[in-house]
UniProtKB/Swiss-Prot annotation:
Protein name (record): NAD(P)H dehydrogenase (quinone)
List of residues binding NAD(+): W12
Region (Disordered): 155-175
GO cellular component, one term: membrane
GO molecular function ontology, one term from the record: FMN binding
InterPro entries the record matches: Flavodoxin/NO_synth, Flavoprotein-like_sf, Flavoprotein_WrbA-like, FMN_Rdtase-like_dom, NQO
Domain of life, source organism: Bacteria
Binding site residues for FMN: 10-15, 78-80, 113-119, 134
Cofactor binding summary note: Binds 1 FMN per monomer.
Cofactor(s) needed for function: FMN
EC number in record: 1.6.5.2
Residues in Flavodoxin-like domain copies: 4-190
Source species taxonomy: Bacteria, Pseudomonadati, Pseudomonadota, Alphaproteobacteria, Hyphomicrobiales
Family per record: Belongs to the WrbA family.
UniProt source species: Chelativorans sp. (strain BNC1)
Length: 199
């Protein structure tokens, strides 16, 4: 049974919801799924004033534990079109894993949350994937196999590179049913591909 880590950062709960949906999908594919988050870097007083969701069910991950998993689903909140500093800081601490080749040939997929439709989702997906490629990880995209991303009748997350969601600048828009379904689809796809590689 493939061991999948869903690792995310979420300020207001949007990516937390996407991570839970992706975990459900991975579980449907028969994977042993663990959901964890990266540590918050914003001082607590500042985070509380900004109404961050500081109490989240997922435990805090440590960088070196990534070696224990077969595949990964990364949930990324963006800042100015890039991955958040919280996830970047976490990945910057994985140097020992890189030096030992511990993540080589392990599948990974990425989802992104932005405040606006044009807030850099595709750039954040690509730049996060670049960091994972330095580890030799195998990138598993959402792809157009998930047809729910097509159409322009409403605000609709998704890109061939990974699932996306838009929160609005005040955080008032939570992931839609279509976006949560896309996250579930992406999680299941990652788990199915991982299972084929760990046989």
């Amino acid at each position: 049974m493939a061991k999948i880590l869903v690792l995310y950062y979420s300020s207001w709960g949007h990516m937390e919801a996407m991570a839970m949906a992706a975990a459900r999908g991975a579980g449907e594919a028969g994977a042993n799924v663990t959901i964890k988050r990266v540590p918050e870097l914003v001082p607590e007083e500042v985070a509380r004033k900004a109404h961050y969701k500081l109490e989240q069910e997922a435990q805090i991950a440590t960088p070196l534990e990534l070696a224990d998993y077969d595949g990964f689903i990364f949930g990324v909140s963006t800042r100015y079109g890039m991955m958040s500093s919280q996830l970047k800081n976490f990945l910057d601490q994985t140097g020992p894993l890189w030096a030992a080749g511990k993540l080589v040939n392990k599948p990974a997929t990425v989802m992104v949350s932005t405040a606006t439709q044009h807030g850099g989702a595709e750039i954040a997906l690509a730049s996060t994937q670049l960091a994972l490629q330095h580890h030799g990880m195998i990138i598993v995209p959402l792809s157009y196999a998930y047809q729910g991303q097509s159409g322009n009748d409403t605000v609709r997350g998704g890109a061939p590179y990974g699932m996306t969601t838009t929160s609005d600048t005040d955080g008032s828009r939570m992931p839609s049913a279509q976006e949560l379904e896309g996250a579930r689809f992406q999680g299941k796809r990652l788990a199915e591909i991982t299972a084929k590689l760990v046989r």
